[in-house]
């Protein structure tokens, strides 16, 4: 952690996270222009999935700007749209309970991934080699695309079009 390469990589990650944040803000401005919430949410997830998967193929640090801009699109949509879509799919009673359970479906996978992700990645790594973390990014991209398809399983009952 004291090597020059490590410090340069850490600095570059900070730049990429800033690019992701900029992409998120710009996409958040665009989201209200779309009337169909499920469509824009699914599109955002697909764009984020493409961003994550593209990191596998990109070998130029500056081209990663495009990848992280796309990841920012998914991030912007994930902050608000799932709860809006869910509340529109529920009728009044027990809404707090459902929202709490829904929040658990977000938090529990994050905790499991943080606790076990490295171990799972190591299972697919040859003995004596470092695990290829890029596989986790590709997996994240695939999961976002699967999630985009699942968006259409939810039927909003009120306010279908904003």
Please give the residue ranges for each predicted region.
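Loop-to-transmembrane helix entry
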Residues: 1-21
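A membrane-interface helix-boundary motif in multi-pass transporters
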Residues: 6-7, 119-143
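Loop-to-transmembrane helix entry/capping segments in MFS-fold secondary transporters
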Residues: 10, 90-102
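Helix-to-loop junctions at the C-terminal end of transmembrane segments
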Residues: 25-38, 121
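C-terminal ends and interior cores of transmembrane alpha-helices
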Residues: 47-59
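Hydrophobic core of transmembrane alpha-helices in multi-pass small-molecule transporters
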Residues: 63-78
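Intracellular juxtamembrane helix-capping segments at the cytosolic ends
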Residues: 77-91
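Multi-pass alpha-helical transporter architecture, strongest
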Residues: 136-162
